[in-house]
Amino acid sequence: MKKHVVVYKKLAEPLLARLRAECEVTYFEAIDAGNRAAFAAAIRGAHGLLGASVRLDRELLDPALDLRIISTISVGVDQFDVDYLRERGILLANTPDVLTETTADTIFALILASARRVVELAEFVKAGCWTRSVG
């Protein structure tokens, strides 16, 4: 019997196909007021959850007696009551360091843009002032 996984974040179709090959999947591209009740009902029979950006509190997870793992597609775990998950024996997986290199790249790009006055000079060119010196 396949394990039941509830996905609550938009995923690329090839990833969903791989997951569906191994598991019974209930899929929500996003959670909102219109589908929150259906999401809560789906969680009740789930063995695993995969998603991000939705607060999964005790009230929502208490009825999920078969739940064994939650995997968040994010670095942070602030939307989870980690102590409660530990009490229940529910594993919590996240993606630590996934943004480390991107953050460093952004910082260096901002440093260079600031040092070379990129935004100021781009506005200068857009305004048609490129025929004179910036100084």
Which residues are covered by each model-predicted region?
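N-terminal glycine-/charge-rich "phosphate-binding" loop or analogous flexible N-terminal tail
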Residues: M1-G48
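Structural motif corresponding to alpha-helix initiation and N-cap regions
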Residues: E13, D32-F39, V54-R58, Q79, ...
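Alpha-helix initiation/capping motif
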Residues: A12, A42, R117, C129-G135
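Residues that scaffold the ATP/ADP-binding catalytic core of kinase and kinase-like folds
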Residues: R18, L121, S133
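Short gly/ser/thr-rich secondary-structure transition/capping motifs
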Residues: F28-G34, G51-A52, V125-G135
